């Protein structure tokens, strides 16, 4: 629900705030430190303005920005955990909130490119979820593909949280993976520019509907002298309808009430359109228990490491050379 009720904590469920953080202009390590201070200040201000809020979400690239000339340099990378995430943890502990934060994480293997990483911190100041972006926005992004799968953790108000990062949300299988592992509130943090504004909104809704779960999504907002970032934080109900839709304003705080138990109840009680169940029990009316093998070729091929499109050999772009990245793999841009 999005209304004047979104100012306070609901009796059941929880109140979430998604921050349309202004796209940072980052040219030095001092700029990153300034962003961290700004994020922490905003977290405390949001809690003061919305005393009932229990989860505060910041978008992708809000910590380190999108300076593509420098974003792989050692100066711009963080360790997770590290002193910067400790600062976020202390802020969550002081404000007594859950927080979602974006980092570009130094790869423990110095021969490989960094990870694009999201963390969830609880009100005790503990990192309870760490996720590395599984699907970087190729061919633009140089991040190493994530290796932590799609983790799920306990959140406020009976929620089970998962986080995806920007382009991850365009991959329906990833939302299904989160739901399959019990997620009922799927968070998406993004740094998209306006080229995919409509598709971002569409997939936030479809990810909710296909999996009977809430989605909470927030994007950077503003202009960085190259692109405009559209903001438009969005909270979707488990039936795929939009409960709250932000605007294009930097610093806009998009709030809404979420009732995870309602999503859980739909998963338990719906017959029609309980599609996450039907996938693994197709035709259960005619065949008791249903057919458990969906018979989908791409799933079998993907599991066997043999995924290949019929047109793959004729594709024009399959590496990052169009954006100046080397094609040899390994660590570059130190």
UniProtKB/Swiss-Prot annotation:
Enzyme active site: 60, 133, 166
PROSITE patterns: CN_HYDROLASE
One GO term of the biological process aspect: putrescine biosynthetic process from arginine
Reaction equations catalysed: formamide + H2O = formate + NH4(+)
CDD domains: aliphatic_amidase
GO molecular function, a single term: N-carbamoylputrescine amidase activity
Gene3D superfamilies: Carbon-nitrogen hydrolase
Keywords: Hydrolase
Domain of life: Bacteria
Domain spans labelled CN hydrolase: 14-260
Enzyme nomenclature, EC number: 3.5.1.49
NCBIfam families the UniProt entry points to: PRK13287.1
Record function comment: Is an aliphatic amidase with a restricted substrate specificity, as it only hydrolyzes formamide.
Family in the record: Belongs to the carbon-nitrogen hydrolase superfamily. Aliphatic amidase family.
Protein name: Formamidase
Gene that produces this protein: amiF
